Structures are given as structure tokens and as C-alpha cells.
């Protein structure tokens, strides 16, 4: 097999793509299901393709190579009082920037200002013809050309290999405060989520926790404001303000997926608050299944224990009409409702005419 | 062709196919009045099924079509093509669903931008993107051109608020992407479609995210002796860690126009006015306004005017949002530019635009979204003077090249349209252009959807307009 499989520059990545008939770029493989592809596909590691290329704090933007661990970026941003508002997942586990874009995964903080798709500005990527192309821009506002950077969010590397990504960032809030609210079951939790989401409080994160009994609500802003707002929230629902240590434990646990079954399937489901109860009921019938509802009830992460046949989950999600993608473990890649319009094939053909990257079905 | 038009008329009965010259005249131009082109016919569908039938007809007949909302495109995005039809979407105005629990609205493409927020207002929700034309522009047009507005730094552009799109593609295929959830599974098709300038088809039903209206605002207007001082104030605000909802600057000429048009009042003797707006909970705004006011006070303004109530805030915004049309009163014709530069180079960009304007002998008014580096130089000219339009376009071209040189973009929110056709290849190399053309061909193998926008089209270019808008010539509208 031609070498090298660990390109260190965008040009080397393009060369590596060109020298393999079938290829997929992988980062730290924190979402291993996404790179579980047929054996004839060469896996290109982006571990050497790392580093921050440009960071201009006054522009609210940075550009980094695709294999850069998100943790490194978060540290560089924090030194300048900035952050990635979508709360990247698997941060401490080593997730890369490119992997985060291709998987389209955002953490609890995406509730306030949006997810990966809302902060990506530009990319350099290698298409199926082996060409290194720049799309989008490096400024916070740009609408010249087609928005391929957004399209590549959630594209699983099936349309091209990311070399470099430019993101918008925000100044970090002065303070944060987490409340743990009691919610007796899914329906009660859904009511808390929807009421808090529509409130004046401007919550930063709003999650129904995997314990099935509580809602984690995070506020961000000037410290004095958070105290006043939290008193109002605790007058509305029973609960408590968590100490900074407790709060960090909760959010880290969620961000790093430590609540999930080790080795079992982990499935991301796009939902709305009104299906939370139905989703809970559907997964409760699958023995020992765990569920984390994030982003104010807009995404569910379902964790199956290894003994549960994934087809059972797929069947239930399809029954509810919910689209889903498997991130970890042994379950069908598209684990929920799915439509495959003709245009999907035509766009795949346009960007990858020789089928160099895995099919969207693999 | 007459036979084809006859069959077309059957798809939109009751006289909703316009073919008479005086009917076509009203559609010859959009807000980029320097260009005009007369289409073969205007089809006015009343249902999304009729839109699908029209597009399928066009596909079958290889007939080019241009979708049009309110025709407010500043880049000529809805300029008709002479060998095709216009599909006017103004009658598709239903808000099909407004769900305050999920905080979404599902709308037809002809719904006017501000009507969404008006419908959501009883639930204390709103639709965030607010282009200056929000009172008349449609959501379909906003989607096609990924419209911006004054609040993009914090809230993003149209694409950031689109959750789902049902669209008819130029092949006649009807697709549904995304849905009511704020999260997506698989590639972001809605993101790709948004900003495709009508080249990927027509959105039939759009799911918008609604946000809770901010509880409290703090809007400050500050006047400065020089543009540079206003720019420095922006840098200081950005460096402070505050995240304002809006950061806007108007220069002396733009101020003069706003005063004349809407009787806006600004501190006398100012070369620039800065508008900064904080928003959030009352507690957060109370804490942040102290910091903001201190930063502005330290930036040595001639005068600083915080809005004391909602009325004063609206007055500040009215002056800002009327600036384009107000500048129109200063001059018979003008071109609005939409380049973006890195924020730290705003001062340099403005100085060089000023120098170029002086060299060319043209007046340029500047209104811009300082928070995101999005410039809107308005080049004033008199189209009746021989060569004036050409000189203005040459200046506009130099400004765009300047933006590219500085690492920015030729368009922040108006799109490429026909206006910036020549400049897209300056931002993207031949292979990148080829990639985009391959994508376009995937969506539209026949090249019938809004041809000649974003990418040049072989064949007859649009006629260029000199002097008055065709409707003014016809006595239908006037500028007083």
C-alpha cells in the first residue's frame, strides 16, 4: 500500500488522497463507527496534520489544520479569553477539529448560539479528484460561492478530506453557574426544557441528564446577573445551585460521554422536545439503555449496552420517524429514519466522481 | 415559443401568466437598478404545487427561470433572463405553522421577513436575521442569498436560522432537508442550499428557528470627529470581551442623508457615528452597560447618547436602516458595495476607499457593520453623465479587489448576483470554480435555474440601465 498514511501538510494530504484508490481521513477515532469502512479503504491519519495556522483574537476567528486536537485550540482560545461556543464533544478524549466537523457533533453549549455548522467559516479540503480546494472564507461574514463548509459538517468524510478549517469564536462569558433541577420523568423534563428555553433567562445549556431524574441548566454571563436569574429559576422548580466542582463533573461527564456504556453503540438522534417522552418510552423497552437529551431537547444520545441488538433501536427510531447516526459501537451507520433523494447521489458524484471516499452507505 | 407559453398559461390559470409589455416592465429590474432585462413571461403561482409544476415544465422545455420574491436583491439576483420566465412567489405568503413550544415557524417563500417576527411576537419570540429591507424582502429571497443584517456577529446570517427546507430542484425533484430539530443528521444540505442564489432551485417551505426576544436592550449612539476614532472605539469594545448584538458605523455623507430622509438627529460636527447595542437579561445588561459606557466614554466621542427608552432606540435604528434609500436622495444613481475585510483593517480599508474615490472624482458614503468587517460603500453617480456608470463600476471593482487583497470577501450578505460576476474568480482559483460548477451541474444539469447569476453565462448579457428606473420612466414610482 502506498505511503505515507500520515500526511503532515495539506499538500501531503492531497498527495495521499491521490495515491489511494479508496481512502478515508480519520482523526483520533473518538467516534469509531464513522471510520468502520470496507477493508479496501485506506485510512489516512491526520495526527501529523496539526497546529493552529492563524489566530487573530480581535477578529474572533482562528484557522487550524484538521488533525489539531480541539483541546489544544480550546486552550489557545482560553488564554485570550475566548471559546468555541458549541462545546465540542470528546475534548479531553482527544477529538480533532476535522473529526468534530465531519461528525457534526456539538455539546450542551450549542443550545445558546448554535452548533458546529453555525461557527464554521471556511475549509481547505481535498475532493475526490485529489484537488486541494479552499471554500468559504476567513472572515466572520461571507456569502461568496456555495457554502460547502457547512455542507461538510456531518458529511463523515464521504465527500472530501478536510485539511484545514476556519472557525468563528466568541469572547468567553465572565462567569457560569449550573443548576440541577428535579424532573420526575421524561414528560416533566420536557416541560422544564421548553419553558426554560422560551424564558428570559438565556440559558447556555439545557440538558435532561442520563440519570433520568434531573435537568442540568447552565447560565453564562456577568456573575451578578447569574445569581439573580438562578434565584428566579429555583423559585420556579425545585433544585440546587451546584458548586463549580460539581458543575464541572456533570458537564465533563456529558462532554466526554463517560455516562455511556463502554463498548456499546452510541447513537445521535435529531429530535424535538415534543418527542422526548416517546423516545424515552421507546428506549426503555431496550434493557439498560441510557439516554442523554441535550440542546434543550433537540438532540438525543442513546447508549446501548453490548447485549442489545442495534436493529431493535433502529426499528424504534424509524417508527418515531427520527433520523440518527451511529457514532460508536456496532450499529447501522444511519440508525433511524432516512430519505435518499437523487440529488444526494448527484452531489457525491460531483465531488467524488471516482468513488475514492467511502460511499455514504458505508 | 408562443405555443409553449400557451401551455404554461394552463399551469397558472386565471390570468396569472403575464406577457404584455407593460406587465413585464414591472419585473425588468430588482434593487440593482443599473441592470434590466425583459423576460418572456411572469408566472404567478398561488400554491407550492403550482411552483413544482412550473419548474417541471421549465425542465421539460429547457426554459430558463428566475424565482423572485420582492425583488430587493442588491446584486441583481432576481434580474430576469430574456429567454426565460420569472416565477413570482409573492402570493405564497402563508405561515403554515408557528410552534411556540418548539420555537419554530414553517413558512412559504413569499412570507415577508418582518411578518415572521410579528407572528411570533405574542409568544415573546422573534426571527433574528434583520436585513435592512426586512419590511419588504421575503424569506425565500433571504434563503437564496443568505441575507445578513445588523446582528450577524452574534446571531449569524440567514443560514444559521434555517432548520429545514422543502425545495423543488431544477430537475423537478422535490426534496426535504432537515426538519424541526436544531440538530442535523448527515451533511448540512440546508446550509448548502442557503446562499445558492437560486441556482439550486426554489424553496417551497422553510422551517425557521425562532429565538426568545431579548428582555432588555442598551443602545448607545456616539459621534466622533473622525472615522478612525469610531473604528478605534469598535476595537476597544471587541477587545473588552463584551459581545454586542450590533456594532454599526455611518460616515458623514451617510449621516447627512439620514438627516435629510428621516429627520434623524446626530451630534453636530461628527465625521462618524457609532451605534452599539447590548442585549440580554435585564441583569446582564445592567452589568454590561456600565462597562460599555466606560469604554465608549474613554474613546473620546464628541457626544454619547444612550437610548433612554424603546422609542429612542427605534429612532436610532430607523436612521441606520434608512441609510441606503436616504443616500439615494443625494444622488440620481448609486451602487451599494458589500465587501468584507478583517475587522482590524477596517480603518485602512476606509482610508483607501476614500483615496480611490477622490482619484475617481466620485462621492462615496459609508455605512457598515463594523462588528463583522462588512463594508457598504455607496458610490454616488449620475447615470445621465456619459461614462459615469462605467467610472462607478470601475471604482466598485477596485474596492472589491481591495477586500480580497486584505483577506476578506467580495460579498458579506448581498451575494454575487450579476453585479460581482467578474470578481468571484478573483476569490477562488480555477479548480475551486470548477468544483462549484460541478456542484451546480449536479443540481441543474440543464443550467436553467437563475442562469447568469454567480457564474457568467454564455450569450447575451443583461442590458445596463442608465438614468431612471424603468418604473420611474413609466411614471409608476417616483423618488419625490
Where is each model-derived feature located?
Chain A
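N-terminal glycine-rich flavin-associated loop
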Residues: 1-23, 46-93, 105-138, 173-181
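Short cationic amphipathic helices and targeting signals
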Residues: 3-6, 62-64, 177-182, 212-225, ...
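Glycine-rich beta-strand-to-loop/alpha-helix junction loops that act as flexible
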Residues: 24-31
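Conserved glycine-rich FAD pyrophosphate-binding loop
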Residues: 37-40, 47, 240-362
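Short, conserved charged micro-motifs
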Residues: 71-73, 186-191, 224-231, 275-281, ...
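FAD-binding subdomain of flavoenzyme oxidoreductases
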Residues: 86, 93-206
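A conserved active-site cap/scaffold subdomain adjacent to cofactor or substrate pockets
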Residues: 176, 182-183, 191-243
Amino acid at each position: 500500500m502506498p505511503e505515507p498514511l500520515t500526511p503532515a501538510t495539506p499538500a501531503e494530504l492531497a498527495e495521499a488522497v491521490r495515491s489511494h484508490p479508496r481512502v478515508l481521513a480519520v482523526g483520533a477515532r473518538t467516534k469509531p463507527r464513522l471510520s468502520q469502512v470496507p477493508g479496501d479503504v485506506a485510512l489516512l491519519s491526520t495526527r501529523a496534520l496539526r497546529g493552529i495556522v492563524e489566530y487573530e483574537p480581535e477578529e474572533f476567528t482562528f484557522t487550524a489544520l484538521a488533525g489539531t486536537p480541539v483541546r489544544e485550540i480550546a486552550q489557545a482560545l482560553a488564554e485570550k479569553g475566548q471559546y468555541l461556543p458549541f462545546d465540542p464533544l470528546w475534548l479531553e478524549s482527544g477529538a480533532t477539529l476535522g473529526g468534530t466537523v465531519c461528525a457534526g457533533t456539538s455539546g450542551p453549549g450549542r443550545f445558546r448560539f448554535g452548533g458546529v455548522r453555525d461557527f464554521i467559516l471556511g475549509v481547505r479540503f481535498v475532493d475526490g479528484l485529489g484537488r486541494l480546494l479552499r471554500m468559504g472564507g476567513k472572515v466572520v461574514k461571507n456569502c461568496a460561492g456555495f457554502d460547502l463548509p457547512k455542507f461538510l459538517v456531518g458529511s463523515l468524510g464521504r465527500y472530501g478530506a478536510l485539511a484545514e478549517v476556519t472557525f468563528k469564536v466568541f469572547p468567553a462569558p465572565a462567569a457560569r453557574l449550573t443548576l440541577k433541577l428535579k424532573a420526575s420523568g421524561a414528560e416533566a423534563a420536557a416541560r422544564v426544557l421548553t419553558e426554560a428555553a422560551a424564558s428570559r433567562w438565556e440559558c447556555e445549556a439545557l440538558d435532561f441528564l442520563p440519570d433520568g431524574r434531573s435537568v442540568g441548566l447552565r447560565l453564562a454571563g456577568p456573575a451578578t446577573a447569574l445569581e439573580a436569574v438562578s434565584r428566579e429559576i429555583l423559585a420556579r422548580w425545585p433544585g440546587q445551585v451546584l458548586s463549580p466542582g460539581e458543575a464541572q463533573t456533570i458537564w465533563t461527564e456529558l462532554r466526554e460521554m463517560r455516562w455511556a456504556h463502554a463498548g456499546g453503540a452510541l447513537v445521535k438522534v435529531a429530535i424535538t422536545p415534543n418527542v422526548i417522552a416517546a423516545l424515552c418510552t421507546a428506549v426503555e423497552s431496550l434493557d439498560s439503555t441510557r439516554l442523554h437529551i441535550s440542546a434543550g431537547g433537540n438532540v438525543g444520545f442513546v447508549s446501548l449496552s453490548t447485549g442489545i441488538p442495534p436493529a431493535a433501536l433502529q426499528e424504534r427510531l424509524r417508527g418515531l420517524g427520527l433520523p440518527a447516526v451511529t457514532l460508536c459501537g456496532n450499529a447501522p451507520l444511519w440508525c433511524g429514519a432516512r430519505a435518499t433523494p437523487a440529488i444526494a447521489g448527484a452531489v457525491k458524484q460531483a465531488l467524488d466522481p471516482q468513488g475514492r471516499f467511502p460511499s455514504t452507505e458505508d | 415559443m408562443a405555443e409553449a407559453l400557451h401551455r404554461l398559461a394552463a399551469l397558472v390559470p386565471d390570468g396569472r401568466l403575464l406577457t404584455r409589455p407593460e406587465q413585464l416592465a414591472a419585473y425588468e429590474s430588482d434593487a440593482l437598478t443599473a441592470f434590466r432585462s425583459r423576460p418572456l413571461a411572469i408566472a404567478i403561482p398561488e400554491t407550492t404545487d403550482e411552483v413544482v409544476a412550473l419548474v417541471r415544465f421549465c425542465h421539460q422545455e429547457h426554459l430558463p427561470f428566475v424565482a423572485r420574491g420582492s425583488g430587493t436583491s442588491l446584486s441583481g439576483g432576481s434580474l430576469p433572463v430574456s429567454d426565460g420566465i420569472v416565477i413570482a412567489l409573492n402570493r405564497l405568503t402563508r405561515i403554515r405553522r408557528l410552534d411556540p413550544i418548539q420555537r419554530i415557524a414553517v413558512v412559504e417563500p413569499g412570507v415577508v421577513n418582518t411578518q415572521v417576527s410579528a407572528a411570533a411576537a405574542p409568544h415573546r419570540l422573534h426571527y433574528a436575521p434583520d436585513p435592512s429591507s426586512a419590511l419588504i424582502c421575503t424569506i425565500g429571497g433571504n434563503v437564496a442569498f443568505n441575507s445578513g443584517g445588523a446582528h450577524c456577529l452574534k446571531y449569524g446570517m440567514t443560514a444559521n436560522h434555517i432548520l429545514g427546507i422543502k425545495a423543488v430542484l431544477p430537475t423537478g425533484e422535490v426534496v426535504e432537508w432537515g426538519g424541526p430539530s436544531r440538530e442535523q443528521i448527515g451533511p448540512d444540505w440546508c446550509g448548502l442550499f442557503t446562499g445558492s442564489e437560486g441556482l439550486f432551485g426554489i424553496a417551497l417551505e422553510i422551517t425557521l428557528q425562532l429565538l426568545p426576544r431579548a428582555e432588555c436592550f442598551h443602545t448607545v449612539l456616539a459621534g466622533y470627529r473622525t472615522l478612525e476614532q469610531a473604528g478605534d472605539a469598535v476595537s476597544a469594545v471587541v477587545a473588552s470581551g463584551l459581545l454586542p448584538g450590533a456594532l454599526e458605523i455611518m460616515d458623514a455623507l451617510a449621516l447627512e442623508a439620514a438627516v435629510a430622509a428621516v429627520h434623524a438627529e446626530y451630534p453636530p460636527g461628527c465625521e462618524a457615528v457609532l451605534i452599539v447595542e447590548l442585549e440580554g437579561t435585564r441583569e446582564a445588561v445592567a452589568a454590561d452597560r456600565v462597562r460599555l459606557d466606560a469604554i465608549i466614554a474613554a474613546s473620546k466621542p464628541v457626544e454619547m447618547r444612550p437610548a433612554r427608552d424603546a422609542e429612542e432606540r427605534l429612532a436610532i435604528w430607523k436612521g441606520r436602516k434608512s441609510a441606503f434609500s436616504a443616500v439615494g436622495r443625494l444622488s440620481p444613481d448609486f451602487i451599494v458595495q458589500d465587501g468584507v475585510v478583517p475587522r482590524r483593517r477596517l480603518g485602512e480599508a476606509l482610508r483607501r476607499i476614500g483615496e480611490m474615490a477622490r482619484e475617481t472624482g466620485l462621492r462615496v458614503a459609508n455605512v457598515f457593520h463594523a462588528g463583522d468587517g462588512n463594508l457598504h460603500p455607496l458610490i454616488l453617480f449620475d447615470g445621465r453623465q456619459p461614462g459615469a456608470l462605467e467610472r462607478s463600476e470601475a471604482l466598485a471593482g477596485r474596492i472589491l479587489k481591495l477586500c480580497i487583497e486584505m483577506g476578506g470577501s467580495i460579498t458579506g450578505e448581498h451575494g454575487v448576483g450579476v453585479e460581482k460576476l467578474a470578481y468571484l474568480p478573483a476569490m477562488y482559483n480555477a479548480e475551486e470554480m470548477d468544483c462549484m460548477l460541478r456542484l451546480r451541474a449536479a443540481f441543474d444539469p440543464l443550467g436553467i435555474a437563475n442562469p447568469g447569476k454567480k457564474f457568467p453565462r454564455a450569450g447575451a448579457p443583461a442590458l445596463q440601465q442608465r438614468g431612471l428606473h424603468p418604473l420611474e420612466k413609466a411614471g409608476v414610482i417616483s423618488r419625490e
